Amino acid sequence: MKLTCMMIVAVLFLTAWTFVTADDSGNGMEILFPKAGHEMENLEVSNRVKPCRKEGQLCDPIFQNCCRGWNCVLFCV
């Protein structure tokens, strides 16, 4: 019984801790992972827009690198 109560308290504590420490800002990952040194030195390169894939081209489902309006399912469709 004591072990069960301790487990419940631990789970509640960890859940509360997760919500308290969560970063709710829109650019949280940008703050956690600052730009690489070479991007900071050459701002023109870092601000360049990366090319997108057009309809029918191979794409990366993880990064969703298709142009706007297209969905990535191995190919931009």
Swiss-Prot record:
Expression sites (tissue/organ): Expressed by the venom duct.
Which Gene Ontology molecular-function terms are recorded? sodium channel inhibitor activity; toxin activity
Disulfide bonds listed in the record? 52-67, 59-72, 66-76
Checking InterPro entries in the record gives:
Conotoxin, Conotoxin_d-typ_CS
Please tell me one Gene Ontology term that the record gives under cellular component. extracellular region
The propeptide sits at: 23-48
On whether Signal is a keyword of this UniProt record, the answer is yes
Which keywords accompany this UniProt record?
Disulfide bond, Ion channel impairing toxin, Knottin, Neurotoxin, Secreted, Signal, Toxin, Voltage-gated sodium channel impairing toxin
Q: Where does the record place it? A: Secreted
One of the Pfam families matching this protein, by short name: Conotoxin
Signal peptide from the UniProt entry: 1-22
Q: What else is known?
A: Negative results: does not show effect on hNav1.7/SCN9A.
The domain-related comment in the record is: The presence of a 'disulfide through disulfide knot' structurally defines this protein as a knottin.
Q: What does this protein do?
A: Delta-conotoxins bind to site 6 of voltage-gated sodium channels (Nav) and inhibit the inactivation process. This toxin shows weak activity on rNav1.2/SCN2A (EC(50)=2.5 uM) and rNav1.4/SCN4A (EC(50)=4.8 uM). In vivo, injection of this peptide in the head region of garden snail induces retraction of the head and body into shell. This is followed by secretion of viscous green slime and a convulsive undulation into and out of the shell. No apparent biological activity was observed when a much greater dose of peptide was injected intraperitoneally into mice.
State the family named in the UniProt similarity comment for this chain. Belongs to the conotoxin O1 superfamily.
Q: What is this protein called?
A: Delta-conotoxin GmVIA
Organism annotation: Conus gloriamaris
